[in-house]
Regions:
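Conserved phosphotransfer cores of two-component systems
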Residues: 41-43, 67-72
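Short, flexible helix-to-coil linker/hinge segments that flank and couple to helix-turn-helix
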Residues: 87-88, 92, 96-146
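Acidic, metal-coordinating helix/loop segments flanking the phosphotransfer/catalytic sites
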Residues: 31-47
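Conserved phosphotransfer microenvironments
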Residues: 47-66, 79-86
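Conserved acidic segment of CheY-like receiver
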Residues: 1-10, 14-18
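Short hydrophobic/Thr-rich beta-strand motif most characteristic of the beta2 strand and flanking loop
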Residues: 23-31
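Conserved active-site segment of CheY-like receiver
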Residues: 6, 78-82, 103-104
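Two-component signal transduction core modules
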Residues: 48, 75, 98-100
Length: 150
């Protein structure tokens, strides 16, 4: 796993959750896009946990191009808020992208990490409902989540 998030508390929490998982052999950090690319060169099959909103990407296209460059990597977008347009563009571009929101329950985040470790796509309940509804609001989490996809 490569944790690409600029919030120290989020990194610490993610490290803690991942350290409790059975199949987590490698935990790395990246503080910017250059470090992320360097880590992906060394570990091209890694799962990247990315807070897109806090990272130095110029847009969804740049993230998709990076995925094309490192085709064997999987991505779990882990952010506070993502626009529906961004989510559609990225999630429909490749099955390698999944999404969980920072306000999801611990159980839903753990499910997302378990799916990611098995190279399975995960889309949290709120985002899947948002995409299915055709709404154009941002993916700001709701207080209650019912069912997860994995």
């Amino acid at each position: 796993f490569i944790i690409a998030d600029n919030q120290d508390i989020t990194k610490a929490g993610m490290m803690f959750l991942l350290s409790k998982q059975k199949d987590t052999a490698l935990l790395l950090e990246a503080d910017n896009k250059a470090e992320l690319i360097q880590q992906l060169r060394l570990h091209p099959e890694a799962v990247v946990i990315l807070d897109y909103t806090l990272f130095d990407f110029t847009g969804a296209d740049e993230l998709i191009v990076l995925h094309e460059r490192f085709k064997t990597a999987d991505w779990l977008l882990f952010s506070d808020e993502l626009s529906v347009g961004f989510l559609r563009q990225v999630l429909f571009s490749s099955m390698a992208f999944g999404v969980a929101l920072k306000d999801n329950s611990k159980e839903e985040i753990l499910t997302a990490l378990q799916c990611a470790s098995r190279k399975e796509r995960f889309i949290c309940n709120h985002v899947s409902n948002l995409l299915l509804s055709g709404n154009n609001q941002s993916a700001a989490p709701r207080p209650h989540s019912a069912k997860t996809l994995c």
